[in-house]
Amino acid sequence: MDKGEAEQIVSHQDLSEDYQKPLQTCKNKCFCKKCCYHCQLCFLQKGLGVTYHAPRTRRKKIRSLNLAPLQHQSISTKWGRDGQTTPTSQEKVETTAGSN
């Protein structure tokens, strides 16, 4: 066995050990070609766009100050419509009904 074959066997063993290790997270946010291909995890995430978890979305908080007065009002006043008719509208209805 010469020196070249021994180095090749050692490098082969190093590579097989590297594949047995779990993938380590990379803190690099760069998407250049060098950074995308420097490790298997970066290639999957940056180069191919594969993610194994969905990004967390934040829900918008509802302001409790605006909802507190609305909860104590009736439904008809919340939307700006009165459920009861006013005396002037009743008079208009009577006059239009009487003219027909």
From Swiss-Prot:
Per UniProt, subcellular location reads as: Host nucleus, Host nucleolus
Task: Pinpoint motif Nuclear localization signal, and RNA-binding (TAR) by residue range.
Answer: 54-60
Provide the Gene Ontology terms for cellular component: host cell nucleolus
Q: Which GO terms describe its biological process?
A: positive regulation of viral transcription
Q: Where is this region: Core?
A: 43-53
Listed GO MF terms: RNA binding; RNA-binding transcription regulator activity
UniProt keyword Transferase, yes or no: no
Subunit info? Interacts with host CCNT1. Associates with the P-TEFb complex composed at least of Tat, P-TEFb (CDK9 and CCNT1), TAR RNA, RNA Pol II. Interacts with CCNT2; the resulting complex is unable to bind to TAR RNA.
Question: Which family does the record assign?
Answer: Belongs to the lentiviruses Tat family.
Q: What is this protein called?
A: Protein Tat
